[in-house]
């Protein structure tokens, strides 16, 4: 269910969270329920509900977002990693503020399997 910026947990974390990396309209924070040794979330500083709304970004902003995801992994010391985006409730999205999961190191296989499962009707 889409959220409003005034009720959005990630909007609050953008404003007041413990950022591990920040630049050019994006921040990275640690996930509070990590499924890997390194589990970071990359968030745009302005509220966009989901990846479906990627057109809210200009081409230049979208390029900066992708570069920021890569820079976040590099800043965390990751050479090999996964990048995930959950889109919609059926795709596993639980917080409706666009975010990218950057996962590196050892994975908790049980949590990873649960995170990758899609809801089916």
Give the label of every model feature segment.
Residues 1-121:
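HIT superfamily nucleotide-processing domains
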């Amino acid at each position: 269910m889409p959220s409003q910026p005034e009720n959005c947990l990630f909007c609050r974390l953008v404003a007041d969270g413990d950022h591990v990396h920040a630049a050019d309209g994006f921040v990275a924070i640690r996930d509070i329920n990590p499924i890997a040794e390194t589990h970071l979330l990359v968030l745009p500083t302005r509220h966009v509900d989901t990846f479906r709304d990627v057109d809210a970004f200009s081409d230049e902003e979208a390029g900066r977002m992708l570069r920021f995801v890569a820079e976040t992994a590099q800043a965390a010391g990751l050479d090999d990693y996964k990048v995930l985006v959950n889109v919609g409730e059926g795709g596993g999205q639980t917080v409706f503020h666009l975010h990218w999961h950057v996962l590196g190191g050892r994975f908790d296989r049980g949590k990873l399997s649960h995170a990758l499962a899609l809801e089916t009707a």
